[in-house]
């Protein structure tokens, strides 16, 4: 009898010991797996740059959602500012450390070092082809030039407003503009745009649809063209498609994270003459022409007042964002 009891106790103790060993082994294996996984995650995290992607929006929507202006009560600790200037500014200043100097001056106005970006462009024509607006707030300095007044006005109309655009196939279709907010925007290295209005029988009015030489020329070798024709009338178009892209666009409203500072000139360029443009002269301003150092000093002095007229945006934009595809 005692032998049976001892055997039972021995088997019970052996089972407990074996179970304890199995549990410890499982624990060690799980620890190894978890620690190895965490190590892999840490290593990969240092090697991979995360990227946020947007979502497709309906035709009635805008990729540019305005946020409440946070500049009223707090410094710009979480905002970025892009300052766009012509190359002649840096050429005149001729100082390799001028940007660092301005960054320190912006710091005195509440903009932390690293939050202000300086973007150089060659000229108005080149900038209009690819106006990249990356920051929460974007200030564009444009030196007035009477020979480029039309280019400056069209560029201002483009970047101060949001546009919803579709591609156009001008080889197959006729197009008409439905209302005053409907424009055709052409961009490229060289854009020549010709139009031929059509009657109800699709015959040219004062032109032959088979002969582009008889079309009305509305732009010649320009980099940016905003074409406005008579509403409700079909048009046959001829565009230098090898060097230019044309799109059918609808003006949605003001892009309030952009402001233009005209440097010099007798008057501020007025784009509000367009019936589709709501008055927005507070984001189109002028400062007297001086040396470029004086221009930048003036911008630093008044940057916070300028920002008060703008709204911070939810995302940065590049040139493709001007073309909202359906």
From Swiss-Prot:
Q: How is it modified after translation?
A: N-glycosylated. The N-terminus is blocked possibly by pyroglutamic acid.
Which cysteines pair up through disulfides? They are 82-135, 165-249, 191-244, 196-207
Pfam families (UniProt xref): VP7 (PF00434)
Q: Which residues bind Ca(2+) 2?
A: 177, 228-229, 231, 301
Q: Which InterPro entries match?
A: VP7, VP7_1, VP7_2
* Keywords, comma-separated and alphabetical: Calcium, Capsid protein, Disulfide bond, Glycoprotein, Host endoplasmic reticulum, Host-virus interaction, Metal-binding, Outer capsid protein, Signal, T=13 icosahedral capsid protein, Virion
Q: Which GO terms describe its molecular function?
A: metal ion binding
Where is the segment annotated GPR motif? 253-255
Q: Where is the signal peptide?
A: 1-50
Q: Which residues are glycosylated?
A: 69, 238, 318
Show the segment(s) annotated as CNP motif.
Answer: 165-167
List residues binding Ca(2+) 1: 95, 206, 214, 216
Q: Which GO terms describe its cellular component?
A: host cell endoplasmic reticulum lumen; T=13 icosahedral viral capsid; viral outer capsid
As for subcellular location, the record says: Virion; Host endoplasmic reticulum lumen
Superkingdom of source = Viruses
Family in the record = Belongs to the rotavirus VP7 family.
| Protein role | Calcium-binding protein that interacts with rotavirus cell receptors once the initial attachment by VP4 has been achieved. Rotavirus attachment and entry into the host cell probably involves multiple sequential contacts between the outer capsid proteins VP4 and VP7, and the cell receptors. Following entry into the host cell, low intracellular or intravesicular Ca(2+) concentration probably causes the calcium-stabilized VP7 trimers to dissociate from the virion. This step is probably necessary for the membrane-disrupting entry step and the release of VP4, which is locked onto the virion by VP7.
Self-association state and partner proteins as the record states = Homotrimer; disulfide-linked. 2 Ca(2+) ions bound at each subunit interface in the trimer hold the trimer together. Interacts with the intermediate capsid protein VP6. Interacts with the outer capsid protein VP5*.
Q: Which HAMAP family match?
A: Rota_VP7, Rota_VP7_A
Other remarks in the entry: Some rotavirus strains are neuraminidase-sensitive and require sialic acid to attach to the cell surface. Some rotavirus strains are integrin-dependent. Some rotavirus strains depend on ganglioside for their entry into the host cell. Hsp70 also seems to be involved in the entry of some strains.
Q: What is this protein called?
A: Outer capsid glycoprotein VP7
Organism ancestry: Viruses, Riboviria, Orthornavirae, Duplornaviricota, Resentoviricetes
